[in-house]
Amino acid sequence: MSAAAKPKVYGWCPGALRPMMSGDGLVVRVRAPLGRLSPEQARGLADLSQAHGSGLVDISARANLQLRGIREDAHAALIDGLRALGLVDEDAGAEARRNITLTPFWRAGDDSHQIAQDLAQALRGAEDLDLPGKFGFAIDCGETPVLQDTAADIRIERGPDGLILRADGADSGLPVTARDAAGEALALARWFLDQGGAPEGRGRMLQLLARRARPTAHVAPAPIAPQGETQHPGQTASGLLVALEFGQMPATTLAALADHGALRLTPWRMLLVEGARNLPPLPGLILDATDPRLRVSACTGAPGCPQARAMTRDLARDLAPSVPMGQHLHLSGCAKGCAHPRPADLVLTATDEDTFDLIRNGTAADHPLNTSLSADALRAAPDLLTEGS
């Protein structure tokens, strides 16, 4: 990656009270309690997006909603609207700490549900806990794990003998109960800070474990379970799972979905519509599990992101049918690779206005196999993606 291509790394994620400026206005991230929106909240968010922003809504890789294109002079009014909907914390510190990803398949009263409620309350009150902006918790206590590929620093899962608290990347952990899991998770977060895990306010658990021993009490075997079956649009026991094209939908689609049930947010850029069995076609929705767009990830790109060096989504849409079944294409506007931080089979990283590097089996920042591929050339000969592989 050339020095000119190096993107700016902020080290924190936007929130509602601490938004981030992008190329299309403010990005305001909404962390819905329990990762769930009631129909009233979903309609309210759609109205706020249209009134104060671009009318585009993203779902992030940590199961949060992002309102895009919010005008700076409308931010205060937006926050008032979010407060009325019960979708904003008391202060930016509490909002930043409450970085929880919850399995969308929780049931009312089950372990995941109880722990998520307790942990959210504990984090709001832990004013001394100055965690890095990207530090997060995953609660995945169902019989089959579904969040193993979701970024998190502290994980609460179901092990062979019950619930277990595990530092990300560790193959051992601390047995817990649903009652004490939240408190032990906070203790592990404090251990992370005490061990110097956040120099200059940044750092992740995986990096700390690579250079230090784990907590002395975390000795119970906790082999890292393989990720459960890849999630696709379709029927589940809890409702209908629907995907969003590149993780984005117009606010009108969000409002229309609310007519069919409460919405659960997922880290797969999908929504779970509680109790639904059928949905009409709506702009931005993918209902077919074989849709080739599911084999492609693409960030906002230019001009929506000031760090993107090229437009991304039109090209991603055009190339999707050429991505082989079972493979994934990540099209990134810069080397940060926000849309798909993990390695992908095929990666196109923008290096100039109409120029991309091709990387195979890597991330957007890895060394390219081919350079200076134009968007027109890729459209004309999409087999360039897999040629010689």
List where the protein language model places each region.
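Flexible helix-coil linker/hinge segments at domain or subdomain boundaries
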Residues: E90-A94, W191-R202, A377-S389
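Terminal amphipathic helices with adjacent charged low-complexity linkers/tails
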Residues: A74, G197-E229
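Short beta-alpha connecting loops at secondary-structure transitions
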Residues: G169-L174, P303-G304, G362-S372
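Small-residue-enriched alpha-helical segments and adjacent helix-cap loops
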Residues: S2-K6, S22-I164, D171, P175-R179, ...
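Short flanking/linker segments adjacent to small metal-binding domains or redox-active Cys/His motifs
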Residues: G125-E127, R360-N361, D366-S389
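Short, low-complexity, intrinsically disordered N-terminal peptides in bacterial proteins
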Residues: M1-G11, V219, D383-S389
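Internal alpha/beta scaffold segment
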Residues: G169-E200
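Intrinsically disordered, low-complexity polar/charged tails and linkers
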Residues: S2-P19, Q227-Q231
